[in-house]
A protein has these predicted regions:
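Binding-site signature for planar aromatic cofactors or substrates
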Residues: 1-254
Length: 254
């Protein structure tokens, strides 16, 4: 499989960023060469100890539960350490063919409609979200041995919302959004050249929100809360959205 095949062509149309699964030739090659690889062996056995999560203390709605945990990550109650940057989250997307990719983004808001983050609409993640409007977000709050998985359908946020959030960004980040053709292959000086160009263009003026920049919202149909415990006997509770709009809560085996 060529590198082009692996990473897709950013200049390509939005519908098929990453074509096709790995070819058999590539898999055979990997199997042949695997014995030559030096194994990085990790034998640590960290023990996680979070406050126990029980059905009795779970909120009836996952949004409420998320709010409680997020507030505890920011301002922890006695005995729990604070979480550095709890809004940092791993967002997983996939192509129409089902090839996944993941990367970190910053959660910028959450309400009954879903979980919002902002990005470039021509980036790899956005091209994948256009081709396959489903995503998963994973929060890992190491300090508190907590994990949350959100799975749902996605939609772009209203233009007005993107513009009003963009207006709150520092000027440098606003100009960066104009300069960066996110996920595109570029030359060594392209970014600086483009930044210089947009600095000139917006000199003495407010920086508008570019058309190619804005938010995505994940409207969840599944949210799981994971709380780490000793001997890998963690607590897991999954909320699943039912046809009648109610959330069904199940405990899952760790
Ligand atoms: C902690 C952290 C937060 C980030 N936040 C964002 C973000 O909010 N939006 C964004 O577009 N990229 C963000 N990035 C960069 C992305 O991880 C990624 O490199 C970029 O969006 C391009 O991804 P893509 O090529 O898969 O589209 C962040 C990276 C880190 C490590």
């Amino acid at each position: 499989m060529s590198a082009q095949h692996m990473f897709g062509d950013p200049s390509n149309s939005s519908s098929q960023p990453n074509p096709g699964p790995p070819s058999p030739t590539r898999s055979t090659h990997r199997a042949d060469s695997i014995s030559k690889h030096k194994l990085v062996q990790i034998t640590s056995h960290n023990q996680y100890t979070s406050p126990r999560l029980t059905r009795e203390i779970l909120a009836p709605s996952p949004l409420e539960q998320f709010r409680t945990w997020f507030a505890e990550a920011q301002s922890p109650p006695n005995g729990l350490p604070a979480v550095a940057e709890p809004e940092a989250t791993c967002i997983s997307t996939s192509t129409a063919a089902g090839i996944p990719s993941a990367r970190m983004v910053l959660l910028r808001g959450v309400d009954e409609r879903g979980f919002v983050f902002f990005t470039n609409y021509t980036s790899r993640k956005s091209r994948e979200l256009i081709a396959n409007p489903h995503a998963s977000m994973t929060f890992y709050w190491k300090e508190q041995a907590r994990q949350i998985r959100v799975v749902g359908t996605v939609e772009k946020v209203e233009r007005e919302e993107s513009e009003s959030y963009f207006a709150t960004r520092p000027r440098g980040s606003q100009l960066g959004a104009w300069a960066s053709q996110q996920s595109k292959e570029i030359g060594e000086t392209t970014l600086q050249d483009r930044l210089d160009k947009f600095e000139k263009e917006f000199e003495g003026k407010e920086v508008d929100c570019p058309e190619h920049w804005g938010g995505w919202r994940i409207d969840p149909f599944e949210i799981e809360f994971w709380s780490g415990h000793t001997s890998r006997l963690h607590d897991r509770f999954r909320y699943l959205l039912q046809d009648n709009g109610e959330w069904k809560i199940d405990r899952l085996s760790p």
